[in-house]
Amino acid sequence: QDSNNPWAISFGVNAVDTRTSASREGLNWFDQHFSQLFDVKDNWNILPSVSYLGVSRYVGSGFSVGLSGSVNKIDKAVYFNPSAPGHDPRGMIVTNPGDLMYYGIDATAKYSFMELIKSKVIDPSLSLGGGYVFLGKDSYGTVNPGAGLTLWFTEAIGFELATKYKTSFGNREDIYGVIDSPSHFQHSAGLIFKFG
């Protein structure tokens, strides 16, 4: 986005990974949050359809602000239980919590490095925002640091990849140690159109 095309609309597919909340003692911070990050088959929840929509506006000096909404279905919840049947070597187990519906609403401020690296195609970015998640019967706020990469096919059409670490304000555990309000990664891939 830029002053010539300050508005952008994006849409595509999102994936939710709750593995980051299944941390256990004895692991360093990096392993607690990033081990199995790309275990798509076992840990990622993906709806096979358009599942996020965003709108944003350029405000100057590489910064833009935006709102987005997403929907998903959580049929893979990861938690730490080394005594449960089927756990992996680290004691993690994946269960279906009951096909919980996931709805997310997020506000984000993003900084694009495109002008800094003097590119017209490659557009890396960092973002920070806040949001609210509705997960089954629970709802909770999140703080969302993130990173993204957009590849612009033309001046106005691009392919966008992004990830956010949605830090929960309410990691409440039930009697089985399963987190009701999990922090999680949300990854997205889709098309972005900018206009003015």
Regions found by a protein language model. Give the residues of each.
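Outer-membrane beta-barrel "beta-signal"
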Residues: A8-S10, V16, I105, A109-K110, ...
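Transmembrane beta-barrel strands of outer-membrane/channel proteins
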Residues: F11-A15, L67-V71, L126-Y132, A147-L149, ...
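Membrane-embedded beta-strands of outer-membrane beta-barrel proteins
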Residues: L53, A107-A109, L126, P145-A147, ...
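Short glycine/proline- and aromatic-enriched beta-strand/turn motifs that initiate or cap beta-hairpins
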Residues: Q1-S56
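Gram-negative (and chloroplast) outer-membrane scaffold detector with strong preference
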Residues: S56-V143, F193
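Outer-membrane beta-barrel proteins
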Residues: D42-N43, L135-K137, Y176-D180
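Predominantly the C-terminal beta-signal and adjacent terminal strand-loop region
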Residues: D2, T20-R24, F30, F34, ...
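Residues that define the transmembrane beta-barrel architecture of outer-membrane proteins
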Residues: N5, I46-S51, D99-I105, I122, ...
